[in-house]
Amino acid sequence: MSTTTKKSLESKLQQLKCHFTWNLMAGDESLDEFEDKVFNKDEFQKRECKATMCNILAFVKHRRGQNASALKELEKAEQFIQQQHPDHVEIRNIVTWGNYAWVYYHMGQLEKAQAYLDKVRQVCEKFSSPYRIESPELDCEEGWARLKCTRNQNERVKVCFEKALEKDPKNPEFTSGWAISNYRLDFWPAQQNAVDSLKQAIRMSPNSPYVKVLLALKLEMNQENQGKELVEEALREAPGETDVLRSAARFYYKTHDKDRAIQLLSQALELLPNNAYVYYYIGCFYRSKVLQIDSRRETSQNENREQLLKQAIYYLKKAEETKEMIKDSCSYLAHLYVLAEQYKEADYYFQKGFKKELTPGLKQLLHLRYGNFQFFQMKCEDKAIHQYLEGVKIRQKTKPKEKMTNKLRFIAERRRSQNGFDSKALHILAFLQELNKESQQAAKVSERGQDSERPVFSPSLHEGGNEQ
């Protein structure tokens, strides 16, 4: 095939609606991070999306250079589409065929790539378009793919399902996708009223256990009993569905039934024995029980506390051993070892935590915890000061930064009261004074920028907008 023909083929491939053209990976996201997010971290595993998952896995396999495995996943996707959508096989297969074409193109098997392009064209030409058509099924498939693969495209996900619903407003699958996207939009980027859409999805498809748990999570603040009924109903309907078990565990944790939450996650762990995030959350729930005992100073619970502490450490260590990508597992482990008075192990996990690529907020928290460890347990004030200073140098306003600033000021004032010429105390105070000046200056610059860019709202928009 000539170079000109190859370029023509690539031009046609770019017109396809499939995982190779949807830009599902964030720009700074590694393939390991993408795969981990989709197949481990994200709890959503809708039964009706088996073909979607095979297509995503095929995309990942291709990116890893495992094209033979990618083709096998695409074969599975075709089989699931045949089973789950026998009346819409051609339309539903357009995405899978597009993925086939891309994989064969990258393998250099251009004739096979063209053959799958021809299959797509034959379907699309029925709708007067060569390689791309507007179809609710395709909008739905794109919506599911983006729902699984992205975290910052919730508005776009919602638009996909809304477009599908415009053409088929009574479709239960489209309504479920729309409701789930509304639920996610309730957290980021803006507040939505997800309750009504979740209720609508359940009315249209009563056997939607995952959606029922999402509704329960929305109701738990004010209607806990109704939420609990929905969760237990979902668990009866789908006792072996990991997304139901994991989301139900979140519900019980939020309603302060940590034992039930741990029980549900333990069931999920039997089905997902290599999922670091399930280990991680079980460990976090045990950790929460330990901290609750400590905060109440329940000395009668000392024996129970010791067992809970061991469990928390065990599960968080398993999470760290299974997947080192979880950012704050080392910080939690170090803190737990401090509580267990195992200081060598605590220091090991503090050091390991600093080697991870942490967000500014998590790094500040780690500096605070390590500083406290040096100050209170190791009785090494100089090392504690070093950690607090490193933490407050990070340019992000957080609660840990405020705590470290206060600790530094307290240490400096105490040292200066004992020796007015203490060089370290004077250095700390000078540093904090300079830091305060920088913060005030940055705040003024930010305020001036906001004044100059402040939009002028029309009365109708202002009056009808969401008040938050």
From Swiss-Prot:
One Gene Ontology MF term:
RNA binding
Q: Where is this gene product found?
A: Cytoplasm; Endoplasmic reticulum
Modified sites of kind N-acetylserine: S2
Per the UniProt entry, what is one GO biological process? defense response to virus
Q: What induces it?
A: By interferons.
According to the record, the residues making up region (Disordered) are 441-468
**What name does this protein carry?**
Interferon-induced protein with tetratricopeptide repeats 2
Q: What lineage is this protein's organism placed in? A: Eukaryota, Metazoa, Chordata, Craniata, Vertebrata
- Per UniProt, what is the name of the gene that codes for the protein in this document? IFIT2
